[in-house]
Amino acid sequence: MSPLSIISRRPQPQFRRRQPRHIEFLGLPFSLLQQVEVIRLITEQGGAPYRYIVTPNAYHVVTVHDEPKWLLPVYRAAWLSLCDSRIVRALARFDRLPLPLVTGSDLIAALLATLNATDRNHTPRRILVIGPQRAVEGVLRAVYPNLTIDVMPAPGALGQSADMRRAVARACMNRTWDIALLCVGCPAQELIAQQLGELGCKSGIALCVGASIDFLTGASSRAPLWTQKAGLEWAYRLSREPRRLWRRYLIESPRIFRIFMTERALRGR
């Protein structure tokens, strides 16, 4: 039995928080919500206690399996856990599980557009973007003029430095925001989201959404739609950034198939 399978069955009272409808798959919780439902929930959370959203893909699943004691509680503490991978969804379908696909990039584009439209005659929603270069701030403000946009660049290699992650979390605490978009990669963004709660963040929603803002602003090119639908977005991204992504897509992420088969064997399927 895998370490993650054992840990996932233990109670996590200090981290666990009730989520809207969810299932367990590959050792992680996944919310059974469509994108439109997620946006509705987010927009209805004004004044609610602080909470965060994770968007696990194949790489996230593998990363959590590598460090279950460290990372699994972080994903379990999330308010929502949205499937951001067509490969993960395909594996779920193979197991006859109705797992919706809600990619971080599509979610953020739709969420900001919705907030921009609904905030036209109300107090503008304050959006803090952590990670990208400050140059994207002007682009976002031009596209979403009815939102208050604040971009906070973050250093690289946050995944290897607990001190740097805590410094970023403290910097977020010193800003005023309703929604924070954490765009610093897995697992740094999820750990920072959890740290915000530990530091006493009272309200707001943090979304862990990787490179979504880079795609949205054109800083990075997203795969053509047909490539996305074919489940080959990873190949497109690899072709664009081979030095940075070759290990993730060719060595680490494919391990999800072994994880899937191990989980099926444990369930007796």
Regions found by a protein language model. Name each.
Residues A154-Q160, K202-R240:
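Short, flexible loop segments at boundaries between secondary-structure elements
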Residues Y50, H122-R125, C201-I205:
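A short helix->loop->beta-strand "cap" motif at the edges of active sites that frequently abuts
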